[in-house]
Every structure is written in structure tokens, then in C-alpha cells.
Design a protein with these regions (language model features):
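Alpha-helical transmembrane segments and their immediate juxtamembrane interface regions
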Residues: 147-181, 236
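Divalent metal-coordination and catalytic microenvironments
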Residues: 78, 165, 185
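Alpha-helix C-capping/helix-to-loop hinge sites
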Residues: 83, 166-170, 188-191
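Non-catalytic, topology-defining segments of multipass membrane proteins
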Residues: 1-158, 191-237
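Small-residue-rich segments of transmembrane alpha-helices in multi-pass membrane proteins
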Residues: 93-95, 178-188
Length: 237
């Protein structure tokens, strides 16, 4: 009799589940390695050029624009695209193209992530997912350097979101920010939480977009001293 066979059924189930999570964590992490290698390299080069340019302040002034652009695009895509149930429309060829794209790719991708939150194949983005945006942003950046800075900043934020999202699913933390984000995001994966908590790296934007969890849920998740994002101080309604 093997050591595995001597374990109680519950222990065998828990060991199997932990092994499954470790396996999926590796799959997800290796996908992020690839996207990080490409997009971080470009972004670092552009930001170094901005710092070394003759007009440093002018170049770096567009970093906040990139951050704001990222926060808005992350939230709106998560709430209004990934959580939208597409139906193929025959109204116009263009509308048919985009709705077919949604039905074929976007719906299965995010629905699969919610149904199997530890599936590494549905966890992290691939290089090709954002390649069109990268090509457009980097291409325009050749002629308009501020666009390159905005693109580089956006992709740095995207990579940070990918790693934070990966971490909230697979790791446990003592750090207050990550403990907060793990509770915030994992509750979003429940049936009751899917209509709230669309910010993946911060709960601040949910406050401004009126998609925070209800008060009784926040009390249960965070306790009396609720924290929001990095500063651990939630704005008062």
C-alpha cells in the first residue's frame, strides 16, 4: 500500500487539489513570462529614452496619462466587454464581425476564467491578445513620442495587473494590499459578487463607478477597518 493510499479520502482530495493548483500556477506564470519579456522590454526602452531626452519633464508628463488610460480601459473592458453576453448581430457587416468575435472568443475566455478560477490557460493573457494594440501604439509612437510614452506606461500597468491577478489566485499574503486584493477579487468570482468589484488591481475605481460591494459584504470581507487599494483608507460616501 502506498503512502497516498493510507491517507483519508479528504486528505487525498486536498493533496490532489494542491497539486492541481501548483500545476496551473506554473502554466499561468510561464504565459506571463512571455508577455513580460516582450512588452516590458519595449516599455523600459521607451521610458529610458524619455528620461534621457532633452525635455525630460515633457516626456515624463505623459506617464500619468498612460496610467489613467490604463485604469479606465482595465475597468471598462472588464465590466462592459468581458462581462457582457454577446449575441451575433446581422444589422451591419461591422457589427456582425465584432459580435461574432465576442461570441467566439471573449465570452468563452472570461466565462471560462470565472467557472475555473485556477485554470492556468484561462488566467493570463497571451502576447497575441494585445499585439494589435501594441503594434498601433508603438507604430504611432515612432512619429509622436508622447504616444510611445503613453503606450509604454499602459503596458507596464498591464503587466503589473497580470502579475497581481496571478498572485491573488495562487498565493497567500501578509502584506495588507495583497490581502485586500485577494479578498476583493476572489469574492468577484462568486455568483453574488460578479456584478461588483471589477477593479483587478485596486478597489478605488469601483468607488467612483458605483460598483463597490454592498456595505454588508465589505464588512464581512474586510472587517470594521475596510481598506481600499494601497493606502488602506476607503473614501467616504
Amino acid at each position: 500500500m502506498t503512502a497516498e493510499q493510507t491517507l483519508a479520502p479528504q486528505e487525498r482530495k486536498e493533496n490532489s487539489y494542491r497539486a492541481y493548483k501548483r500545476e496551473q500556477e506554473v502554466i499561468s506564470r510561464h504565459k506571463i513570462y512571455k508577455t513580460t519579456a516582450l512588452y516590458a522590454t519595449y516599455s523600459i526602452i521607451i521610458l529610458v529614452l524619455a528620461i534621457r531626452s532633452g525635455s525630460v519633464l515633457w516626456g515624463l508628463a505623459f506617464i500619468p496619462v498612460g496610467i489613467i488610460f490604463w485604469m479606465l480601459s482595465e475597468y471598462t473592458s472588464h465590466r462592459y466587454i468581458f462581462h457582457h453576453k454577446f449575441e451575433v448581430s446581422e444589422e451591419t457587416p461591422l457589427k456582425k464581425f465584432f459580435t461574432t468575435l465576442g461570441v467566439k472568443y471573449l465570452d468563452p475566455m472570461h466565462t471560462g476564467h470565472h467557472e475555473r478560477p485556477f485554470d492556468g490557460n484561462h488566467m493570463s493573457g497571451r502576447i497575441r491578445d494585445l499585439l494589435p494594440m501594441f503594434v498601433i501604439g508603438a507604430g504611432l509612437g515612432i512619429f509622436f513620442f508622447p504616444v510611445a510614452v503613453i503606450t509604454a506606461t499602459w503596458f507596464i500597468c498591464y503587466l503589473a495587473e497580470e502579475w497581481i491577478h496571478h498572485a491573488t489566485h495562487f498565493y497567500n499574503f501578509r502584506d495588507p494590499y495583497f490581502r485586500y486584493m485577494k479578498k476583493h477579487h476572489m469574492y468577484h468570482h462568486t455568483k453574488q459578487g460578479m456584478k461588483y468589484g471589477f477593479g483587478t488591481t485596486s478597489g478605488i475605481i469601483d468607488y467612483f463607478w458605483n460598483s463597490r460591494y454592498p456595505e454588508h459584504i465589505r464588512q464581512r470581507l474586510y472587517g470594521a477597518k475596510k481598506s481600499i487599494a494601497a493606502n488602506q483608507a476607503e473614501p467616504q460616501a
